[in-house]
Amino acid sequence: MGRSRHHNKLKEGIFEAEITALSHDGRGIAKVDGKTTFIPFTLPGEVVKFEYTFTKAKFDEAKVVEYVKKSSNRVNPPCDHFQICRGCSLQHMSTDAQIEHKQQTLINQLKYIGNGVEPENILPPLRTSNTEGYRNKARLGVRYVSKKGKILVGFRERNGRFLADIDKCIVLNPLVGDKITEISSFIETLSIYQHIAQLEIAIDDTRPAMIVRHLEPFTNEDLEKLRSFAQENNYWIYLQSKGPDTIFRLYPQGDVEPKKLSYQPAAGIDIGFEPNDFTQVNNDINKKMIKRAIELLDISENDSIIDLFCGLGNFTLPISQHAKTVIGVEGEPTMVKRAKETADNNNITNVNFYAANLFESFEDKEWFNNFEYNKMLLDPPRAGAQEVCNNIEKFNVKRIVYVSCDTAALARDAGILVNTKGYKLISAGVMDMFPHTMHVESIAVFEKI
Protein backbone atom coordinates (compact mmCIF):
# COMPACT_ATOMS: atom_id res chain seq x y z
CA MET A 1 0.00 0.00 0.00
CA GLY A 2 1.44 3.38 -1.01
CA ARG A 3 2.36 5.95 1.61
CA SER A 4 0.47 9.24 1.35
CA ARG A 5 2.54 12.40 1.08
CA HIS A 6 2.09 15.20 3.56
CA HIS A 7 1.91 18.69 2.06
CA ASN A 8 2.42 21.74 4.25
CA LYS A 9 -0.49 24.11 3.78
CA LEU A 10 0.34 27.74 3.01
CA LYS A 11 -1.00 30.09 5.67
CA GLU A 12 -3.44 32.63 4.28
CA GLY A 13 -3.84 36.23 5.38
CA ILE A 14 -1.64 39.18 6.34
CA PHE A 15 0.84 38.79 9.19
CA GLU A 16 3.28 41.09 10.99
CA ALA A 17 6.84 40.48 12.18
CA GLU A 18 10.13 42.18 13.03
CA ILE A 19 13.22 41.48 10.93
CA THR A 20 16.08 40.39 13.19
CA ALA A 21 18.89 39.47 10.78
CA LEU A 22 19.94 38.92 7.17
CA SER A 23 20.40 35.54 5.51
CA HIS A 24 23.51 34.60 3.52
CA ASP A 25 21.77 35.80 0.34
CA GLY A 26 20.56 39.13 1.76
CA ARG A 27 16.97 38.28 2.63
CA GLY A 28 15.50 39.47 5.90
CA ILE A 29 14.93 36.87 8.61
CA ALA A 30 11.95 36.93 10.97
CA LYS A 31 10.95 34.43 13.64
CA VAL A 32 7.22 33.72 13.52
CA ASP A 33 5.97 31.33 16.19
CA GLY A 34 9.54 30.09 16.50
CA LYS A 35 9.86 29.31 12.79
CA THR A 36 12.29 31.06 10.43
CA THR A 37 10.66 33.14 7.72
CA PHE A 38 12.69 34.66 4.87
CA ILE A 39 11.35 37.99 3.59
CA PRO A 40 13.23 39.67 0.70
CA PHE A 41 13.95 43.42 0.52
CA THR A 42 13.83 43.91 4.28
CA LEU A 43 16.46 45.02 6.78
CA PRO A 44 17.19 44.23 10.43
CA GLY A 45 15.05 46.31 12.80
CA GLU A 46 12.22 46.76 10.32
CA VAL A 47 8.65 45.74 11.12
CA VAL A 48 6.67 44.54 8.12
CA LYS A 49 3.30 43.16 7.20
CA PHE A 50 3.68 40.16 4.91
CA GLU A 51 1.97 37.24 3.26
CA TYR A 52 3.38 33.75 2.84
CA THR A 53 4.56 32.60 -0.60
CA PHE A 54 6.15 29.22 0.22
CA THR A 55 6.31 26.86 3.16
CA LYS A 56 8.44 23.90 4.22
CA ALA A 57 8.83 22.01 7.47
CA LYS A 58 11.81 24.04 8.69
CA PHE A 59 11.23 27.48 7.13
CA ASP A 60 8.78 29.71 5.30
CA GLU A 61 9.15 32.36 2.61
CA ALA A 62 7.08 35.51 2.32
CA LYS A 63 6.77 38.87 0.59
CA VAL A 64 6.26 42.33 2.02
CA VAL A 65 2.80 43.85 1.87
CA GLU A 66 3.58 46.94 3.94
CA TYR A 67 6.53 48.44 5.81
CA VAL A 68 5.20 49.29 9.28
CA LYS A 69 8.60 50.54 10.49
CA LYS A 70 11.49 51.25 8.12
CA SER A 71 15.16 51.06 9.03
CA SER A 72 17.22 54.24 9.05
CA ASN A 73 19.69 52.24 6.92
CA ARG A 74 17.17 51.88 4.08
CA VAL A 75 17.90 53.73 0.83
CA ASN A 76 16.33 53.75 -2.61
CA PRO A 77 18.06 51.12 -4.79
CA PRO A 78 20.08 52.86 -7.53
CA CYS A 79 19.18 50.18 -10.11
CA ASP A 80 15.75 49.80 -11.71
CA HIS A 81 16.27 46.04 -11.97
CA PHE A 82 17.10 45.39 -8.31
CA GLN A 83 13.74 43.75 -7.56
CA ILE A 84 14.19 41.06 -10.22
CA CYS A 85 17.95 40.63 -10.81
CA ARG A 86 20.06 38.42 -8.55
CA GLY A 87 23.29 40.22 -9.39
CA CYS A 88 22.95 42.42 -6.28
CA SER A 89 21.31 41.78 -2.92
CA LEU A 90 21.89 44.89 -0.76
CA GLN A 91 21.11 47.93 -2.91
CA HIS A 92 18.30 48.85 -0.49
CA MET A 93 20.87 49.20 2.32
CA SER A 94 23.16 52.21 2.77
CA THR A 95 26.80 51.55 1.90
CA ASP A 96 27.85 52.40 5.47
CA ALA A 97 25.41 49.82 6.82
CA GLN A 98 26.60 47.25 4.27
CA ILE A 99 30.17 47.65 5.52
CA GLU A 100 29.09 47.45 9.16
CA HIS A 101 27.07 44.29 8.47
CA LYS A 102 30.02 42.63 6.71
CA GLN A 103 32.38 43.58 9.52
CA GLN A 104 30.00 42.07 12.08
CA THR A 105 29.64 38.93 9.96
CA LEU A 106 33.42 38.50 10.05
CA ILE A 107 33.62 39.00 13.83
CA ASN A 108 30.71 36.62 14.49
CA GLN A 109 32.08 33.86 12.30
CA LEU A 110 35.56 34.12 13.80
CA LYS A 111 33.97 33.68 17.22
CA TYR A 112 31.53 30.87 16.48
CA ILE A 113 33.16 28.89 13.67
CA GLY A 114 36.67 29.62 14.96
CA ASN A 115 35.77 28.45 18.47
CA GLY A 116 36.21 31.70 20.34
CA VAL A 117 38.76 33.45 18.12
CA GLU A 118 38.69 37.24 18.49
CA PRO A 119 41.02 39.75 16.83
CA GLU A 120 42.96 42.06 19.13
CA ASN A 121 42.24 44.93 16.72
CA ILE A 122 39.60 45.60 14.07
CA LEU A 123 41.11 47.06 10.93
CA PRO A 124 39.33 50.02 9.34
CA PRO A 125 37.39 48.73 6.32
CA LEU A 126 38.87 49.16 2.87
CA ARG A 127 36.31 51.06 0.84
CA THR A 128 35.97 52.12 -2.76
CA SER A 129 35.00 55.63 -3.79
CA ASN A 130 32.78 54.21 -6.53
CA THR A 131 30.18 51.59 -5.63
CA GLU A 132 28.92 51.51 -9.23
CA GLY A 133 30.76 50.42 -12.36
CA TYR A 134 33.39 48.63 -10.26
CA ARG A 135 33.00 45.11 -11.59
CA ASN A 136 35.55 44.13 -14.26
CA LYS A 137 34.82 40.39 -14.32
CA ALA A 138 31.47 38.66 -14.84
CA ARG A 139 29.76 35.71 -16.47
CA LEU A 140 26.56 36.80 -18.17
CA GLY A 141 23.95 34.30 -19.23
CA VAL A 142 22.46 34.49 -22.74
CA ARG A 143 19.02 33.14 -23.56
CA TYR A 144 16.52 33.59 -26.38
CA VAL A 145 13.05 33.91 -24.85
CA SER A 146 10.36 33.24 -27.43
CA LYS A 147 7.57 34.77 -25.31
CA LYS A 148 9.47 38.04 -25.21
CA GLY A 149 10.73 37.65 -28.77
CA LYS A 150 14.26 38.70 -27.87
CA ILE A 151 17.64 37.74 -26.49
CA LEU A 152 18.25 38.33 -22.78
CA VAL A 153 21.77 38.98 -21.50
CA GLY A 154 22.54 39.27 -17.80
CA PHE A 155 22.34 37.61 -14.41
CA ARG A 156 19.62 35.25 -13.23
CA GLU A 157 16.34 36.31 -11.68
CA ARG A 158 16.02 36.07 -7.92
CA ASN A 159 14.20 32.73 -8.17
CA GLY A 160 17.24 31.37 -10.02
CA ARG A 161 15.34 29.77 -12.88
CA PHE A 162 15.41 32.39 -15.64
CA LEU A 163 17.57 35.29 -16.79
CA ALA A 164 16.51 38.72 -15.61
CA ASP A 165 15.27 41.07 -18.33
CA ILE A 166 17.64 44.03 -17.94
CA ASP A 167 18.82 46.82 -20.23
CA LYS A 168 21.91 47.81 -18.24
CA CYS A 169 23.93 46.78 -15.19
CA ILE A 170 25.15 49.54 -12.90
CA VAL A 171 27.79 47.47 -11.07
CA LEU A 172 29.49 46.26 -14.26
CA ASN A 173 32.17 48.45 -15.79
CA PRO A 174 30.13 50.84 -18.00
CA LEU A 175 32.09 49.72 -21.09
CA VAL A 176 29.89 46.62 -20.83
CA GLY A 177 27.23 47.46 -18.24
CA ASP A 178 25.84 50.37 -20.28
CA LYS A 179 25.72 48.24 -23.44
CA ILE A 180 23.55 45.29 -22.37
CA THR A 181 20.78 46.24 -24.80
CA GLU A 182 23.27 46.84 -27.62
CA ILE A 183 24.94 43.48 -26.99
CA SER A 184 21.57 41.69 -26.89
CA SER A 185 20.46 43.29 -30.15
CA PHE A 186 23.74 42.36 -31.81
CA ILE A 187 23.48 38.70 -30.77
CA GLU A 188 20.01 38.58 -32.38
CA THR A 189 21.65 39.31 -35.75
CA LEU A 190 23.74 36.11 -35.60
CA SER A 191 22.50 32.94 -37.27
CA ILE A 192 23.04 30.83 -34.13
CA TYR A 193 21.57 33.35 -31.66
CA GLN A 194 19.61 30.54 -29.98
CA HIS A 195 22.81 28.57 -29.38
CA ILE A 196 24.89 31.13 -27.50
CA ALA A 197 24.98 30.19 -23.82
CA GLN A 198 27.22 32.66 -22.03
CA LEU A 199 29.44 35.71 -22.27
CA GLU A 200 32.47 35.82 -20.01
CA ILE A 201 33.58 39.41 -19.48
CA ALA A 202 37.03 40.59 -18.45
CA ILE A 203 38.08 44.24 -18.56
CA ASP A 204 41.65 45.41 -18.11
CA ASP A 205 42.91 48.95 -17.58
CA THR A 206 41.88 50.02 -21.10
CA ARG A 207 39.60 47.56 -22.91
CA PRO A 208 36.90 44.90 -22.50
CA ALA A 209 37.34 41.30 -23.62
CA MET A 210 34.43 38.96 -24.19
CA ILE A 211 34.50 35.17 -24.46
CA VAL A 212 31.45 34.01 -26.44
CA ARG A 213 30.44 30.49 -25.40
CA HIS A 214 28.60 28.93 -28.35
CA LEU A 215 27.02 25.48 -28.74
CA GLU A 216 26.90 25.43 -32.56
CA PRO A 217 29.48 26.63 -35.14
CA PHE A 218 29.34 30.22 -36.37
CA THR A 219 28.93 30.89 -40.09
CA ASN A 220 31.53 32.96 -41.92
CA GLU A 221 29.01 35.80 -42.02
CA ASP A 222 28.62 35.56 -38.23
CA LEU A 223 32.39 35.76 -37.78
CA GLU A 224 32.57 38.90 -39.89
CA LYS A 225 29.76 40.46 -37.83
CA LEU A 226 31.60 39.61 -34.63
CA ARG A 227 34.81 41.20 -35.91
CA SER A 228 32.94 44.34 -36.96
CA PHE A 229 31.19 44.60 -33.59
CA ALA A 230 34.53 44.18 -31.80
CA GLN A 231 36.22 46.83 -33.93
CA GLU A 232 33.38 49.35 -33.51
CA ASN A 233 33.30 48.94 -29.72
CA ASN A 234 37.05 48.41 -29.08
CA TYR A 235 36.35 44.93 -27.69
CA TRP A 236 38.57 41.89 -27.85
CA ILE A 237 36.40 38.92 -28.86
CA TYR A 238 37.21 35.30 -28.03
CA LEU A 239 35.23 32.20 -29.00
CA GLN A 240 34.71 29.04 -26.93
CA SER A 241 32.95 26.01 -28.42
CA LYS A 242 33.61 23.45 -25.66
CA GLY A 243 36.07 23.37 -22.73
CA PRO A 244 38.60 26.06 -21.77
CA ASP A 245 41.18 24.59 -24.16
CA THR A 246 38.96 25.60 -27.12
CA ILE A 247 39.15 29.33 -26.33
CA PHE A 248 40.83 31.42 -29.03
CA ARG A 249 40.92 35.09 -29.94
CA LEU A 250 38.87 36.06 -32.96
CA TYR A 251 39.61 39.79 -32.83
CA PRO A 252 42.10 41.38 -33.01
CA GLN A 253 43.81 38.83 -35.22
CA GLY A 254 47.50 38.17 -35.62
CA ASP A 255 50.49 39.20 -33.55
CA VAL A 256 49.20 42.43 -32.01
CA GLU A 257 50.54 44.55 -29.17
CA PRO A 258 49.70 44.18 -26.40
CA LYS A 259 49.45 40.41 -26.74
CA LYS A 260 47.36 40.08 -23.57
CA LEU A 261 45.05 42.06 -21.38
CA SER A 262 46.94 43.67 -18.50
CA TYR A 263 46.54 45.58 -15.25
CA GLN A 264 48.83 47.32 -12.77
CA PRO A 265 48.53 45.96 -9.21
CA ALA A 266 51.21 48.39 -8.07
CA ALA A 267 53.36 51.11 -9.60
CA GLY A 268 55.89 49.77 -12.07
CA ILE A 269 54.33 46.31 -12.48
CA ASP A 270 52.19 45.15 -15.41
CA ILE A 271 50.48 41.76 -15.13
CA GLY A 272 49.32 40.19 -18.38
CA PHE A 273 46.32 37.87 -18.32
CA GLU A 274 43.84 36.03 -20.49
CA PRO A 275 40.11 36.76 -20.05
CA ASN A 276 39.43 33.38 -18.42
CA ASP A 277 42.27 33.77 -15.88
CA PHE A 278 41.34 34.54 -12.30
CA THR A 279 41.81 38.22 -11.54
CA GLN A 280 40.23 40.37 -8.86
CA VAL A 281 36.89 41.90 -9.78
CA ASN A 282 37.47 45.37 -8.36
CA ASN A 283 40.68 47.11 -9.50
CA ASP A 284 40.42 49.97 -7.01
CA ILE A 285 40.02 47.68 -3.99
CA ASN A 286 42.65 45.30 -5.34
CA LYS A 287 45.31 48.02 -5.30
CA LYS A 288 44.29 49.10 -1.80
CA MET A 289 44.25 45.46 -0.66
CA ILE A 290 47.79 44.85 -1.94
CA LYS A 291 49.02 48.01 -0.22
CA ARG A 292 47.41 46.92 3.05
CA ALA A 293 48.80 43.38 2.81
CA ILE A 294 52.31 44.79 2.35
CA GLU A 295 51.83 47.08 5.36
CA LEU A 296 50.52 44.22 7.50
CA LEU A 297 53.40 41.94 6.52
CA ASP A 298 55.69 44.65 7.92
CA ILE A 299 58.35 43.76 5.37
CA SER A 300 62.04 44.42 5.81
CA GLU A 301 64.72 44.08 3.13
CA ASN A 302 65.92 40.82 4.72
CA ASP A 303 62.54 39.06 4.73
CA SER A 304 61.93 35.86 2.78
CA ILE A 305 58.21 35.51 2.10
CA ILE A 306 56.11 32.70 0.69
CA ASP A 307 52.86 33.54 -1.13
CA LEU A 308 50.54 30.52 -1.27
CA PHE A 309 47.65 30.37 -3.79
CA CYS A 310 49.50 33.15 -5.63
CA GLY A 311 47.63 33.06 -8.96
CA LEU A 312 49.25 35.37 -11.49
CA GLY A 313 51.42 36.98 -8.81
CA ASN A 314 48.92 39.65 -7.78
CA PHE A 315 50.57 39.90 -4.35
CA THR A 316 53.87 38.16 -5.07
CA LEU A 317 55.21 40.70 -7.53
CA PRO A 318 54.38 43.86 -5.52
CA ILE A 319 55.79 42.19 -2.37
CA SER A 320 59.04 41.54 -4.26
CA GLN A 321 59.65 45.30 -4.39
CA HIS A 322 60.12 45.29 -0.60
CA ALA A 323 61.48 41.85 0.40
CA LYS A 324 64.73 39.97 -0.13
CA THR A 325 63.08 36.96 -1.81
CA VAL A 326 59.53 35.85 -2.55
CA ILE A 327 58.27 32.42 -3.60
CA GLY A 328 54.80 32.08 -5.14
CA VAL A 329 52.97 28.74 -5.21
CA GLU A 330 49.82 28.14 -7.25
CA GLY A 331 47.80 25.06 -8.16
CA GLU A 332 47.13 25.99 -11.79
CA PRO A 333 50.24 25.46 -13.99
CA THR A 334 49.13 27.91 -16.69
CA MET A 335 48.86 30.67 -14.08
CA VAL A 336 52.36 29.83 -12.84
CA LYS A 337 53.69 30.03 -16.39
CA ARG A 338 52.14 33.47 -16.86
CA ALA A 339 53.43 34.66 -13.48
CA LYS A 340 56.97 33.68 -14.51
CA GLU A 341 56.55 35.51 -17.81
CA THR A 342 55.33 38.60 -15.98
CA ALA A 343 58.32 38.57 -13.63
CA ASP A 344 60.65 38.34 -16.64
CA ASN A 345 58.81 41.10 -18.51
CA ASN A 346 59.05 43.37 -15.47
CA ASN A 347 62.73 42.50 -14.82
CA ILE A 348 61.93 41.14 -11.36
CA THR A 349 64.68 38.74 -10.32
CA ASN A 350 64.04 38.02 -6.62
CA VAL A 351 60.90 35.89 -7.15
CA ASN A 352 60.21 32.35 -8.27
CA PHE A 353 56.99 30.50 -8.92
CA TYR A 354 56.02 26.85 -8.48
CA ALA A 355 52.94 24.79 -9.37
CA ALA A 356 51.56 22.60 -6.56
CA ASN A 357 48.23 21.37 -5.23
CA LEU A 358 48.00 23.05 -1.83
CA PHE A 359 45.06 20.91 -0.74
CA GLU A 360 47.27 17.84 -0.39
CA SER A 361 50.63 17.00 1.17
CA PHE A 362 53.51 19.15 -0.08
CA GLU A 363 56.40 17.91 2.09
CA ASP A 364 58.26 16.47 -0.92
CA LYS A 365 58.14 19.71 -2.92
CA GLU A 366 61.27 21.68 -3.83
CA TRP A 367 59.80 25.00 -2.75
CA PHE A 368 59.00 23.53 0.68
CA ASN A 369 62.35 21.84 1.33
CA ASN A 370 64.90 24.12 -0.31
CA PHE A 371 63.88 27.53 1.04
CA GLU A 372 63.38 29.13 4.43
CA TYR A 373 60.71 31.75 5.05
CA ASN A 374 59.90 34.02 7.95
CA LYS A 375 56.58 35.40 6.68
CA MET A 376 53.64 34.08 4.68
CA LEU A 377 50.78 35.46 2.62
CA LEU A 378 47.72 33.25 2.07
CA ASP A 379 45.11 34.08 -0.57
CA PRO A 380 43.14 30.83 -0.98
CA PRO A 381 39.91 30.19 -2.90
CA ARG A 382 36.60 29.75 -1.07
CA ALA A 383 37.67 26.37 0.32
CA GLY A 384 40.31 28.10 2.44
CA ALA A 385 43.77 26.83 3.42
CA GLN A 386 43.06 24.02 5.88
CA GLU A 387 45.91 21.74 4.74
CA VAL A 388 48.42 24.57 5.00
CA CYS A 389 47.16 25.63 8.44
CA ASN A 390 47.22 22.05 9.72
CA ASN A 391 50.92 21.93 8.80
CA ILE A 392 51.86 25.53 9.51
CA GLU A 393 54.55 24.62 12.07
CA LYS A 394 56.59 23.05 9.24
CA PHE A 395 56.98 26.49 7.64
CA ASN A 396 58.15 28.14 10.87
CA VAL A 397 56.81 31.56 9.83
CA LYS A 398 56.49 34.32 12.41
CA ARG A 399 53.75 36.31 10.67
CA ILE A 400 50.87 35.32 8.39
CA VAL A 401 48.65 37.68 6.40
CA TYR A 402 45.53 35.80 5.29
CA VAL A 403 43.35 37.26 2.51
CA SER A 404 39.96 35.56 2.37
CA CYS A 405 36.98 35.48 0.02
CA ASP A 406 34.97 33.29 2.43
CA THR A 407 34.69 34.30 6.08
CA ALA A 408 33.55 30.84 7.19
CA ALA A 409 36.72 29.25 5.76
CA LEU A 410 38.87 31.99 7.31
CA ALA A 411 37.19 31.44 10.69
CA ARG A 412 37.81 27.69 10.51
CA ASP A 413 41.47 28.20 9.62
CA ALA A 414 41.85 30.91 12.27
CA GLY A 415 40.59 28.40 14.82
CA ILE A 416 43.36 26.00 13.77
CA LEU A 417 46.09 28.64 13.94
CA VAL A 418 45.00 30.20 17.23
CA ASN A 419 43.69 27.20 19.16
CA THR A 420 46.20 24.53 18.11
CA LYS A 421 49.26 26.11 16.44
CA GLY A 422 50.39 28.84 18.81
CA TYR A 423 49.42 31.94 16.83
CA LYS A 424 47.42 34.96 17.93
CA LEU A 425 45.06 36.96 15.72
CA ILE A 426 46.51 40.47 15.76
CA SER A 427 43.93 42.15 13.55
CA ALA A 428 41.18 41.53 11.03
CA GLY A 429 38.89 43.58 8.84
CA VAL A 430 36.80 43.63 5.69
CA MET A 431 37.39 44.97 2.19
CA ASP A 432 34.42 46.04 0.09
CA MET A 433 35.38 44.15 -3.06
CA PHE A 434 31.71 43.61 -4.01
CA PRO A 435 29.52 46.59 -2.99
CA HIS A 436 25.75 45.94 -2.92
CA THR A 437 26.25 42.19 -2.43
CA MET A 438 26.53 39.87 0.59
CA HIS A 439 30.02 38.79 -0.49
CA VAL A 440 32.58 39.49 2.25
CA GLU A 441 36.27 39.87 1.39
CA SER A 442 38.47 40.05 4.48
CA ILE A 443 42.07 40.20 5.65
CA ALA A 444 43.63 38.97 8.89
CA VAL A 445 47.07 39.03 10.51
CA PHE A 446 48.41 36.20 12.67
CA GLU A 447 51.60 36.30 14.68
CA LYS A 448 53.50 33.48 16.36
CA ILE A 449 53.34 33.72 20.14
Swiss-Prot record:
The lineage of its organism: Bacteria, Pseudomonadati, Pseudomonadota, Gammaproteobacteria, Thiotrichales. Its EC number is 2.1.1.190. Catalyzes the formation of 5-methyl-uridine at position 1939 (m5U1939) in 23S rRNA. [4Fe-4S] cluster binds at residues 79, 85, 88, 169. S-adenosyl-L-methionine binds at residues 280, 309, 314, 330, 357, 379. Keywords: 4Fe-4S, Iron, Iron-sulfur, Metal-binding, Methyltransferase, rRNA processing, S-adenosyl-L-methionine, Transferase. The keyword Signal does not apply. The gene is rlmD. This is 23S rRNA (uracil(1939)-C(5))-methyltransferase RlmD.
